[in-house]
Amino acid sequence: MFVEDEKDYIMRMIKQMIRALVSLILGKKFTLVELPNENKYEVSGSTLDEYLMMVDAGRINEAENAILENVDYSDKNDVAAVVKFYEYINEQEDAFLEEHGYSREEVLDGLKQVAEEAGYGSMIGLFLDAPVI
């Protein structure tokens, strides 16, 4: 049971970090922010859908490497696309992630890296230190 509780905790941390990053990127109130479901995001000419299709095909690490190599951290839309990318991975089943050599800890680490590179690292640290609800 402890392992399941830990996974739930990590998933909640990831969701909290995503909400915090999106609110910082878009400048909206933290509790009301969600990225729209329609896919208008691109990273260096590739649509977010292309990266998400790689995830669906089990090429998660390859997709992550590609999106991180191409992201312009000074472009808010690029950063939002990467956050949406990690949100999508976090929504996958544990069995799918395990089968394809990926973990929720990697999602959390990736989000932390994006926050640091985009200049939001110290602010995200505050959110991670807050209680996860």
Please describe what each predicted stretch is.
Residues 1-75, 91-133:
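N-terminal alpha-helical interaction modules that lie
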